């Protein structure tokens, strides 16, 4: 027997074909959300407060200081928040200290700081009753970047940019004349020496001393001449910079100094963040810059006078490692003191080394380092600027390397915690201005923190972020896999990110650093391709927000692959050679072969096993969760695999889902971590279990109660239904499944079913990927799903009185009210069809709406029914089903309703949708199709043992698409069905063709895995043997019921008077320019005329036509379309005298758009109302005559 048994949870065993020993379990798949939010609560929020506070008043006599904060208990539970359309949030209380510096008085007070949304255990937020997710953002990391550019003459120039987390950009660039310029915050460029002089190093010799003698430096110094001898060089430089930054304003050296300090050296205005400081120190680090350079001077230990390295030595990795402590210490450190006019007057410590120029052995190049400022230095320092300039000048000498902007070492993730902290900071900054004014205006003696703090800007910023940010998204809740994928999504869009239109090909493309960090397969098709990605299965964020991936360490001394796990970011990995997970190993862990496949930077090639540093942890670390659920992924073309991964996320939860016979072993973990199942929080024994509740007694005697959701409406309108798995007396351990969620079976993801599939044509019905299906799948509810739709009706106060929910609806027969209760609300369990009343509601009608007869009747009989009109909630088109639930919210019950709303009624209607012609189906390999025909079971082809086939697919769908995985799954699935087992074939480590055939033979199938099929209609065998097997097929969310749409009478657009478009607006079908050509080609003039007039925007004509049709008269001639009038008006607005003349040159009067319609022109709706009114009046007249007769 090929393969070995593996247990997944307590309910499923699979035969696995994996050969690679897994040394690391998958991490919790939603930790990117939960860890980041927890981080924010533990440290991020405190950091934001400490950044903005203390706040001083303008006279600096008072300080408002931050002491601490506390989150109290949430107002609503999760379920209550969902029901009441509220947010699941906790009140936050912040303690402030107000210090009066003149009197020394201190007032400490706790201030309510608004309600802060809290993340649920599932990694989601509940905002206004809807479940939302904050998508992590992929942005360019703060730091220093160097790039090269080639001009039109083929000359190579260099550029450099310092990008902060917030603050001004500082750029350097060279031009065609070999002069180096700098730009501050995208303004006009100035010679870079001007900025050096402004920093207090004004002499030409001083500049050459710092940077060394090079052509770029000399050329720039020549360009940067001393124009005004009355100013010092530094003052002149400062004024020149000020002129660039604030053109047109009077320039003084003092104002320029304070401006530069504010731009770069003030931590409140300029912030590199921890990650920016880390990246700058790493890029400007001398150990990497000196690597493989020839040193041009003796390196001498300053304390002992010992020569550490002699001039002429090549600085190899070993040489650098031997003096690393000295380089990190005080080796070659020089103190430069700026002159008195400088922006920053503190001494600047630089570390300088002289090396031989790689291009010219007779020249010496100076390499300047920033002497590694500490991590907590978040602003730029003069040493950083000088070291950056040095690196930039060194590039022209061939020392150093340019950066690849798409490298994942230069792109980082802003997860939910950081995004929230940024938003909170914006709110606090707005509040700060407000507080400062209040502190200055009001009397110091009586002030308390409560009085000067206005929390509205903070709560508004947070609310705005959750409600309308591009990164706060309505959770994709089609099925548990789509939830999980959404939580692990990485978007390059959003504020501070890219825009779709500007993003080029390079940003979207797969980069070698994506390996193990971002999935190369799972990304949307269309304009967002490559901009929205998914975290790979083992991906994990470090403290700086860079994605790490795990590797097994190779012990270089023994050559053995250890089980020690090392997590590496992309730029750390660049220094090492990594072998693949499937490298063959001996018993002792050493490599079995001399040469192994591996990766170093962007190169995939064979390496000697002796130089390998790390080995991949698992073959599936390359791909995301959805991609890892595709069996035989290695046999599919990448484009189709992309569709397969994306379509699994669109699967509709079925009534009775089944886990796949052929899985990948990922189904269990995905279901477990998705948050859609009920998972045990502690060990214990089940003491009570039913469909809605499970109670578990813990070992310490306490009780855990788990609630099981039944048929709740999900965000996608599908049924979110959990099924209890445990029985009374069962022992459960922490992490066990207590109940399956939607699309799960026995604790495994189960998105579809396992039908018997044959690759064959049948009467041409599976032309172009169409799917032929057996009626069994309809009758036995194999592909039946439940959908829940929510409808609501609210009563408001109007000018004429309040609206009412009632059973007494004018002009509605008793038959239509049979399922309404005494209040006029539909009963639960009622079957409703389109147009049925769900909530009876009447709205007061003004006197002006009444006709003369109605007023007379009102006067005689005091008949109230005439004063209201029917505004009941009715079932819309395609909305028929069974009423599942009704919720009523009123002010009297203490429910929070919008202002002006007195009562809100929500009705939930459940639909049971069987699969039908027009529904979309798919396999897991991107093989999608539409159901074209449902054939009676007796007509379907059948196997020799009499089993009818369930689905027939077109064999032509396989070769050109190159997704051969589906064929392998088909054969293995049939073997699994015959053997009565489930199989796991993990991606890139699954069943080989030998395993496949061995299993096929074990199952007693023919050696080619094909079979004779018999025609169900004739009983004759088909000419050729057919591939028949079991394939996992899913039903997708694109169902024909949601797309079918027809219009007879409906709404029109206000300006053009043409029908609206789309199903949601009950619109018409657009008959466009090309369709008009088609009818013109056939000469179908009358058909064309009525399409362009009655059916579109001939307002008068369509009303007369409607009238004629209802009264059975001939249809009159059409008039002038409204769009013609619009054209005339548009030309008149351009000042053209445009008139319409008839054959006799008489002017034709066009009805003016703004004059309102003529009285004799009625709307279609008015005609409909008139008909109803006429019937009602006839009824009324009958009642009157009856009354008269009785009298």
Swiss-Prot record:
Keywords: DNA-directed RNA polymerase, Nucleotidyltransferase, Transcription, Transferase
GO CC annotation: DNA-directed RNA polymerase complex
Matching NCBIfam families: PRK00405.1 (NF001616), rpoB (TIGR02013)
Assigned protein family: Belongs to the RNA polymerase beta chain family.
Lineage, highest ranks first: Bacteria, Bacillati, Bacillota, Bacilli, Lactobacillales
Species name: Streptococcus agalactiae serotype V (strain ATCC BAA-611 / 2603 V/R)
Compositional bias annotation for Low complexity: 1182-1191
Domain of life where this protein originates: Bacteria
Annotated catalysed reactions: RNA(n) + a ribonucleoside 5'-triphosphate = RNA(n+1) + diphosphate
Assigned EC number: 2.7.7.6
Positions of the UniProt region annotated as Disordered: 1171-1191
Extent of Basic and acidic residues compositional bias: 1171-1181
GO MF entry, a single one: DNA binding
Cell wall biogenesis/degradation listed as a keyword: no
Function: DNA-dependent RNA polymerase catalyzes the transcription of DNA into RNA using the four ribonucleoside triphosphates as substrates.
Top-level class of the enzyme under EC nomenclature: transferase
Subunit description: The RNAP catalytic core consists of 2 alpha, 1 beta, 1 beta' and 1 omega subunit. When a sigma factor is associated with the core the holoenzyme is formed, which can initiate transcription.
Protein name: DNA-directed RNA polymerase subunit beta
Gene3D superfamilies found in the cross-reference section: 2.40.50.100, 2.40.50.150, 3.90.1100.10, DNA-directed RNA polymerase, beta subunit, external 1 domain (2.30.150.10), DNA-directed RNA polymerase, subunit 2, domain 6 (2.40.270.10), RNA polymerase alpha subunit dimerisation domain (3.90.1800.10), RNA polymerase Rpb2, domain 2 (3.90.1110.10)
Keyword set includes Ribonucleoprotein: no
GO BP of this protein: DNA-templated transcription
């Amino acid at each position: 027997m090929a393969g070995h048994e593996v247990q997944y949870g307590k309910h499923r065993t699979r035969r696995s074909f994996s050969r690679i020993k897994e040394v690391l379990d998958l991490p919790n798949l939603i930790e990117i959300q939960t860890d980041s939010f927890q981080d924010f609560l533990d440290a991020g929020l405190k950091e934001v407060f400490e950044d903005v506070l203390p706040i001083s008043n303008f006279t600096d006599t008072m300080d408002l200081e931050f002491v601490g904060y506390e989150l109290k208990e949430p107002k609503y539970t999760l379920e209550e928040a969902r029901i009441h359309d509220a947010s699941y949030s906790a009140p936050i209380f912040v303690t402030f200290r107000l210090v009066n510096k003149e009197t020394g008085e201190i007032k400490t007070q706790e201030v309510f700081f608004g309600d802060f949304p809290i993340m649920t255990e599932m990694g989601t937020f509940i905002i206004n009753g809807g479940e939302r997710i904050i998508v992590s953002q992929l942005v360019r990391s703060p730091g220093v970047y160097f790039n090269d550019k080639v001009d039109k003459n083929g000359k190579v120039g260099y550029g450099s940019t310092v990008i902060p987390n917030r603050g001004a950009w500082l750029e350097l660039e060279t031009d065609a004349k070999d002069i180096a310029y700098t730009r501050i915050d995208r303004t006009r460029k100035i010679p870079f020496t001007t900025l050096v002089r402004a920093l207090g190093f004004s002499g030409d010799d001083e500049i050459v001393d710092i940077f060394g003698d090079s052509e770029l430096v000399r050329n720039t110094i020549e360009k940067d001449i001393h124009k005004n001898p009355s100013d010092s060089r530094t003052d002149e430089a400062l004024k020149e910079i000020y002129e660039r930054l604030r053109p047109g304003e009077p320039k003084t050296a003092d104002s320029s100094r304070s401006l530069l300090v504010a731009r770069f050296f003030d931590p409140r205005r300029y912030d590199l963040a921890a990650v920016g400081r880390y990246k700058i120190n790493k890029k400007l680090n001398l150990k990497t810059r000196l690597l493989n350079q020839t040193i041009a001077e003796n390196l001498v230990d300053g304390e002992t006078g010992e020569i550490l390295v002699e001039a002429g030595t090549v600085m190899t990795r070993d040489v650098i490692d031997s003096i690393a402590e000295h380089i990190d210490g005080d080796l070659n450190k020089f103190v430069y003191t700026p002159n008195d006019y400088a922006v920053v007057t503190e001494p600047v410590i630089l570390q300088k080394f002289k090396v031989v120029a790689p291009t010219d052995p007779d020249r010496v190049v100076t390499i300047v380092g920033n002497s590694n400022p500490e991590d907590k230095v978040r602003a730029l320092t003069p040493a950083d600027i000088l070291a950056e300039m040095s690196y930039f000048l060194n590039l022209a000498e061939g020392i150093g390397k340019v950066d690849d902007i798409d490298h994942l070492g230069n792109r980082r993730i802003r997860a939910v915690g950081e995004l929230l902290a940024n938003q909170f900071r914006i709110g606090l900054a707005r509040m700060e201005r407000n507080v400062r004014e209040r502190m200055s205006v009001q009397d110091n003696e009586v002030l308390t923190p409560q009085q000067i703090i206005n929390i509205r800007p903070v709560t508004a910023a947070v609310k705005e972020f959750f409600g309308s940010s591009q990164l706060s998204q309505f959770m994709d809740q089609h099925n548990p896999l789509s939830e999980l994928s959404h939580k692990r999504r990485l978007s390059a869009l959003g504020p501070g990110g890219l825009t779709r239109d500007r993003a080029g090909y390079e940003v979207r493309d797969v980069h070698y650093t994506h390996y193990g960090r971002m999935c190369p397969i799972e990304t949307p098709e269309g304009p967002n391709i490559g901009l929205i990605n998914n975290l790979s299965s083992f991906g994990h964020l470090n403290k700086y927000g860079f994605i790490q991936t795990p590797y097994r360490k190779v012990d270089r001394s023994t050559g053995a692959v250890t089980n020690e796990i090392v997590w590496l970011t992309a730029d750390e990995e660049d220094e090492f050679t990594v072998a693949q997970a499937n490298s063959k190993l001996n018993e002792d862990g050493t490599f079995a072969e001399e040469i192994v496949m591996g990766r170093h930077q962007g190169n995939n090639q064979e390496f000697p096993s002796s130089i390998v540093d790390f080995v991949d942890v698992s073959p599936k670390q390359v791909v995301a969760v959805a991609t890892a659920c595709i069996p035989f992924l290695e046999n599919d073309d990448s484009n189709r695999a992309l569709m397969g991964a994306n379509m699994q996320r669109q699967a509709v939860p079925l009534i009775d889902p089944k886990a796949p016979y052929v899985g990948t072993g990922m189904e269990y973990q995905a279901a477990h971590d998705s948050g859609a199942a009920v998972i045990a929080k502690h060990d214990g024994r089940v003491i009570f279990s039913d469909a809605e509740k499970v109670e578990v007694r813990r070992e310490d005697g306490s009780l855990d109660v788990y609630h099981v959701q039944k048929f709740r409406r999900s965000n996608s309108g599908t049924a979110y239904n959990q099924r209890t798995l445990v029985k009374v007396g069962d022992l459960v351990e922490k992490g066990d499944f207590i109940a399956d969620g939607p699309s799960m079976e026995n604790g495994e993801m189960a998105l579809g079913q396992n039908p018997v599939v044959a690759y064959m044509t049948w009467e041409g019905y599976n032309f172009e990927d169409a799917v032929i299906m057996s009626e069994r799948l309809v009758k036995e509810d194999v592909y039946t799903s439940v959908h829940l739709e929510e409808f609501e009706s609210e009563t408001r106060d109007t000018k004429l009185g309040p609206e009412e929910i009632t059973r007494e609806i004018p002009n509605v027969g008793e038959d239509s009210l049979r399922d309404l209760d005494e209040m006029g609300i539909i009963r639960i369990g009622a079957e409703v069809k389109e147009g049925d009343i769900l909530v009876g509601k009447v709205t007061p009608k003004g006197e002006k709406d009444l006709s003369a007869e109605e007023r007379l009747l009102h006067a005689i009989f005091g008949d109230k029914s005439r004063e209201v009109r029917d505004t009941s909630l009715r079932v819309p088109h395609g909305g028929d089903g069974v009423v599942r639930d009704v919720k009523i919210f009123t002010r009297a019950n203490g429910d929070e309703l919008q202002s002006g709303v007195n009562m809100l009624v929500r009705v939930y209607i459940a639909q049971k949708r069987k699969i039908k012609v027009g529904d979309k189906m798919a396999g897991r390999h991107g093989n999608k199709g539409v159901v074209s025909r449902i054939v009676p079971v007796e007509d379907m082809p059948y196997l020799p043992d009499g089993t009818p086939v369930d689905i027939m697919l077109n064999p032509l769908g396989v070769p050109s698409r190159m997704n051969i995985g589906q064929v392998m799954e088909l054969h293995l699935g049939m073997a699994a069905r015959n053997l009565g087992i489930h199989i796991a074939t993990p991606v890139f480590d699954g069943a080989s063709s030998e395993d496949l055939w061995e299993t096929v033979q074990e199952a007693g199938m023919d050696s080619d895995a094909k079979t004779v099929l018999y025609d169900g209609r004739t009983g004759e065998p088909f000419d050729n043997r057919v591939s028949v097997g079991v394939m996992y097929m899913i039903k997708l969310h694109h169902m024909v019921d949601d797309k079918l749409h027809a219009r007879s009478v409906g709404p029109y657009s206000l300006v053009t008077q043409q029908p609206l478009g789309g199903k949601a607006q009950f619109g018409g079908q657009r008959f466009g320019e090309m369709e008009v050509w088609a009818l013109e080609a056939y000469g179908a003039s009358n058909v064309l005329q009525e399409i362009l007039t009655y059916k579109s925007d001939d307002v008068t004509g369509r009303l007369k036509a409607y009238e004629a049709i209802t009264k059975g008269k001939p249809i009159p001639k059409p008039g002038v379309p409204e769009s013609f009038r619009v054209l005339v008006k548009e030309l008149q607005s351009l000042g053209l005298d445009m008139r319409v003349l008839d054959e006799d040159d008489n002017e034709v009067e066009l009805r003016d758009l703004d004059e309102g319609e003529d009285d004799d022109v009625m709307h279609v709706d008015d005609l409909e109302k008139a008909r109803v009114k006429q019937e009602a009046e006839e009824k009324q007249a009958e009642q009157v005559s009856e009354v008269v007769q009785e009298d």
